[in-house]
Amino acid sequence: MAPQMGYDRAITVFSPDGRLFQVEYAREAVKRGTTAVGIKAADGVVLLVDKRITSRLVEAESIEKIFQIDEHIGAATSGLVADARSLVDRARVEAQVNRVSYDEPIGVEVISKKICDHKQTYTQYGGVRPYGTALLIAGVDDNKPRLFETDPSGALLEYKATAIGAGRNAVVEVFEADYREDMNMDAAILLGMDALYKAAEGKFDAGTLEVGVVSLEDKKFRKLGPEEVENYVQQILEKHKGTESSE
């Protein structure tokens, strides 16, 4: 009998070596998801997602992986999209309740902790399953860019730059080599796209990329339009075209 037999059927039962297999399986769903990237810059924070469209018959606009939570907060997701939408809807309600109750926008760390608390409860009660999605939550607090990662267990970490999804390892390798805290948002977007290019082995274009930004200047979340994304993509393609031709 396999060592985990029986222990992977109940979310509330630890295996003898201290593991919750259902939580680990939920993390595997994230690892198989599309690659999402978050980067803090000197003047804001950026989110990028490679939507990985698998069929030319799919309308690219119908696939959404970056969501607005509040005026100053956005989130990128990897894993089960339906689970992510449920969490995003909950986060939006929490943000609205905070505005009504306190007449001020909710903090990025506060909303991240609330989502993590909710995800954590789904790891300790019977009759439910963990959320099979991870979120990168980005925004601006007190004139500082903030970037948090939430995983299916409810764990919360703040990063300068990170990634979730299938290409995480390749992206993080690029970040560890090239990330600088003093880079601006333009440079951060190009770094993120460069990392996604390498993670996807060059198989990406403007139609598969989604980009969201929050700047310190106006503290507003917005998604980049197709022409803006195309401009950055062309810079990356030109860079790698030059690199490949010189080799």
UniProtKB/Swiss-Prot annotation:
Species name: Methanosarcina acetivorans (strain ATCC 35395 / DSM 2834 / JCM 12185 / C2A)
Pfam families xrefs: Proteasome, Proteasome_A_N
Keyword RNA-binding: no
Main location: cytoplasm
Stated name of the protein: Proteasome subunit alpha
Tagged with keyword Cytoplasm: yes
Ways its activity is controlled: The formation of the proteasomal ATPase PAN-20S proteasome complex, via the docking of the C-termini of PAN into the intersubunit pockets in the alpha-rings, triggers opening of the gate for substrate entry. Interconversion between the open-gate and close-gate conformations leads to a dynamic regulation of the 20S proteasome proteolysis activity.
Keyword line: Cytoplasm, Proteasome
BP terms from Gene Ontology: proteasome-mediated ubiquitin-dependent protein catabolic process
InterPro entries from the UniProt entry: Ntn_hydrolases_N, Proteasome_alpha, Proteasome_alpha-type, Proteasome_asu_arc, Proteasome_asu_N, Proteasome_sua/b
Annotated Gene Ontology cellular component terms: cytoplasm; proteasome core complex, alpha-subunit complex
